[in-house]
Amino acid sequence: MPRKLISVLSVAVVMSAVAFGAHAADKLNYDAKSFAAAQAAGKPILVEIHATWCPTCKAQEPILSDLEKQDKFKNLTVFRVDFDSQKDAVKAFGARVQSMLITFKGSVETGRSVGDTNPSSIAALLDKTT
């Protein structure tokens, strides 16, 4: 009997985590068509110019992940541009280096930063999308 109760409670905990995770920002691999659609819909957008080998990008990941879970950023759409394989997109955004964060409110660019790993200033950048 206790074993069955533990199983039921475990399932309930997992289901709660899934339900609460739905409030996190949408994170997508960049493609021009989806980005244009998000802009046309007036969505708050973050573009990450990212490289898997970049230590600054790795330092930004947990900061962004925590911020994206906040209720005020639940409608944020995050597009990750691969610095090494998506050179056309990198060029289109005017990015010369990885670890660049660019924010938009619909089609209007609201800010950008390069190499920032300060949670407060990254939060301030994301605030410009709301």
What residue ranges belong to the model's regions?
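Typically the conserved alpha-helix immediately C-terminal to a functionally engaged Cys/Sec
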Residues: 58-72
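Structural micro-motif
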Residues: 93-102
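N-terminal signal peptide c-region/cleavage motif recognized by signal peptidases
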Residues: 19-21
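Bacterial N-terminal signal peptides that target proteins for export
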Residues: 1-10
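A short beta-strand-turn-helix
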Residues: 27-43
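Short active-site neighborhood of thiol/selenol oxidoreductases, capturing the structured segment around
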Residues: 40-52
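Thiol-based oxidoreductase modules, predominantly thioredoxin-like and allied folds used
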Residues: 72-87
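Non-catalytic, surface beta->alpha helical segment in thiol-disulfide oxidoreductase systems
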Residues: 102-130
